[in-house]
């Protein structure tokens, strides 16, 4: 195990919404965005920019037949999206754990250049989980056939002692078409930004009603603090307080909230 004393560099608050609100996506997104803006102003925040961008991605998860990765707290996710009119494949290995030190101690190194993240995920009413991840982007679709091939990219998986020839395949034969809708950038009392977006999963591109709808509020540690070892995890207090108030207020909007939520990963694994 590596050093478990890692600093959190981002926080993400997640709400699973009532999918029955989303028959008309354009109208619903506008209504929900207005609600977020109104509540933000109640807590002395402001909307500094409205977003109109939609991203479209295809997503699937890979695991062994017995879900060995999942049982060890890992997920292996593939995202396909077009960038500059060319398909790109983002391969993400993530470890999620209630104990931040156990999550931080995992070896998520890669043999190719990748983007790393150690973040706190917050779900209702206010429960934290911690995830460490690394994402590697490739021009071609990955073709993993067994654990040995996955561990060639992510060598830390060798420590799980899963037999090398254990096959890897699509989890529950499930693929999602994802629409990511950027909503707005928010500020609470200072210049730091809280980003908001909606993630909607569909079985097909033509479906009207999503399988799952997730709203997220997220912020990263400002760059100047990331680069200062003496100021690690010093998230600005006005941003924390405002985001917390908004997150709790949204949970009171009964028509919008799914009170028997299932995360996206849980949905895939069933």
Residue ranges of predicted features:
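Phosphate-end processing signature that detects enzymes handling 5′-triphosphorylated RNA
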Residues: 1-270
């Amino acid at each position: 195990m590596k050093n478990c004393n890692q600093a959190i560099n981002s926080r993400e608050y997640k709400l699973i919404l009532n999918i029955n609100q989303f028959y008309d996506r354009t109208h619903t997104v506008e209504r929900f965005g207005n609600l977020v803006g109104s509540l933000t102003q109640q807590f002395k925040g402001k909307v500094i920019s409205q977003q109109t961008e939609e991203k479209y991605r295809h997503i699937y998860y890979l695991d062994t037949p017995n879900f060995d990765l999942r049982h060890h707290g890992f997920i292996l996710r593939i995202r396909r999206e077009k960038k500059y009119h060319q398909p790109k494949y983002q391969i993400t290995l993530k470890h999620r754990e209630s104990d931040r030190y156990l999550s931080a101690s995992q070896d998520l190194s890669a043999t190719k250049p990748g983007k790393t993240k150690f973040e706190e995920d917050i779900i209702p009413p206010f429960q934290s989980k911690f995830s460490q991840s690394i994402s590697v982007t490739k021009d071609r679709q990955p073709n993993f056939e067994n654990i040995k091939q996955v561990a060639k990219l992510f060598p830390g998986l060798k420590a799980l002692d899963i037999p090398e020839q254990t096959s890897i395949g699509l989890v529950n034969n499930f693929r999602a078409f994802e629409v990511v809708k950027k909503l707005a950038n928010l500020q609470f009392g200072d210049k730091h930004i809280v980003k908001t977006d909606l993630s909607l999963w569909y079985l097909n591109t033509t479906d009207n009603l999503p399988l799952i709808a997730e709203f997220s509020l997220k912020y990263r540690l400002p760059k100047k603090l990331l680069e200062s070892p003496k100021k690690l995890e010093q998230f600005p207090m006005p941003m924390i307080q405002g985001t917390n108030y908004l997150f709790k207020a949204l949970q009171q909007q009964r028509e919008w909230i799914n009170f028997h939520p299932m995360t996206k990963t849980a949905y895939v694994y069933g």
